[in-house]
UniProtKB/Swiss-Prot annotation:
The lineage of its organism: Bacteria, Pseudomonadati, Pseudomonadota, Gammaproteobacteria, Enterobacterales. PROSITE patterns: HTH_CROC1 (PS50943). The keyword Transit peptide does not apply. Residues 30-49 bind DNA. Cytoskeletal protein that is involved in cell-shape control through regulation of the length of the long axis. This is Cytoskeleton protein RodZ. It is a single-pass type II membrane protein. InterPro entries: Bact_Cytoskel_RodZ, Cro/C1-type_HTH, Lambda_DNA-bd_dom_sf, RodZ, RodZ-like_C. One of its GO terms (biological process) is regulation of cell shape.
Length: 334
């Protein structure tokens, strides 16, 4: 009878009351239980007061109660009916899974975005290529036009100026012919003093030509003596006339490593050169500075002005027709 009464009394007590009584019989405080179970004191207090914290899942609460029962030596089977009331199992709220259609829609949207990105990239690349091709084509047309113009100008100059060098040589030969025949009257010895006076003057003015005439004509020793005395004085004068002039400090020197169209104009507007230069060709131009240059292929020419190389790298990098002006720089006094 006493056993049944005790069992009925235990069933009447709640889970929290039974755990609190068992704890008090063991002489433990709520703080000690909380430290052993690694719980907060407030959680132990809620368990003993049969409270279910709203922020604590029922699964965790049932686990805490079982740990508390093992600590105070209370059989878990006796607490099961009370656990169902104090901490009933609640279905966990599970977020609804995204439907397959939503994932498919998002994937489709990402595909459209990627396609649009590639389309924009292709358009940019295409526009860049078209712009480069137009510039390249325009440069080639400009070079061809300038080459045709220069060829036509060179042909016109050749047709109109072929007689110029011939006239110069004829004039030179005409100037030398009288000079060679002039000393003949001055050779006789028995001429009067009046006729002998102009002979040195004629010989002095035409001393550059007397020497050849004396070398070619075999005359008598008496008649050749006056001319022979004048010959040594004529040699230095003729040698000085043949000596090369000093180099122009404003000379423009160009060496070509490939075929290149070129046009050079000086300060007066005179075209010093206009046409095509072949590989391994050289040009040495002199005019009035500054010079204006148009070069179809800057990479094919090396320019020196006033003894210094001219930098054409900016035109070579952009592959453009070079248009530049070379200004005259003051030369140091010698």
């Amino acid at each position: 009878m006493n056993t049944e009464a005790t069992h009925d009394q235990n069933e009447a007590q709640t889970t929290g009351v039974r755990l609190r009584n068992a704890r008090e019989q063991l002489g433990l405080s709520q703080q000690a239980v909380a430290e052993r179970l690694c719980l907060k004191v407030s959680t132990v207090r809620d368990i003993e007061e049969d409270k279910a914290p709203s922020d604590l899942a029922s699964t965790f609460l049932r686990g805490y109660i079982r740990s508390y029962a093992r600590l105070v030596h209370v059989p878990e089977e006796e607490l099961l009916p009370g656990l169902e009331k104090q901490a009933p199992l609640r279905a966990a709220k599970v977020a609804p899974m995204q439907s397959f259609s939503l994932g498919k829609r998002r994937k489709k949207r990402d595909g459209w975005l990627m396609s649009f990105t590639w389309l924009v990239l292709f358009v940019v690349v295409g526009l860049t290529g078209a712009w480069w091709w137009q510039n390249h084509k325009a440069q080639q047309e400009e070079i061809t036009t300038m080459a045709d113009q220069s060829t036509a100008e060179l042909n016109a100059d050749k047709d109109s100026g072929q007689s110029v060098p011939l006239d110069t040589r004829d004039a030179t030969s005409q100037d030398t012919t009288p000079a060679q025949t002039a000393p003949a009257p001055a050779t006789p010895v028995d001429s009067t003093a009046a006729t002998q006076t102009p002979a040195p003057t004629a010989a002095a003015t035409q001393n550059t030509v007397v020497a050849p005439s004396q070398a070619n004509v075999d005359t008598a020793a008496t008649s050749a003596a006056p001319a022979a005395t004048e010959t040594p004085s004529a040699l230095p004068t003729s040698q000085a006339g043949v000596a090369a002039p000093a180099a122009d400090p404003n000379a423009l020197v160009m060496n070509f490593t490939a075929d290149c169209w070129l046009e050079v104009t000086d300060a007066t507007g005179k075209k010093l050169f206009s046409g095509m230069q072949r590989k391994d060709g050289n040009l040495n131009l002199t005019g009035q500075a500054p010079y204006k240059l148009k070069i179809g292929a800057p990479a094919a020419v090396q320019i020196q002005y006033q003894g210094k190389p001219v930098d054409l790298s900016r035109f070579i990098r952009t592959n453009q027709v070079a248009r530049l002006t070379l200004n005259a720089e003051p030369t140091p006094a010698q």
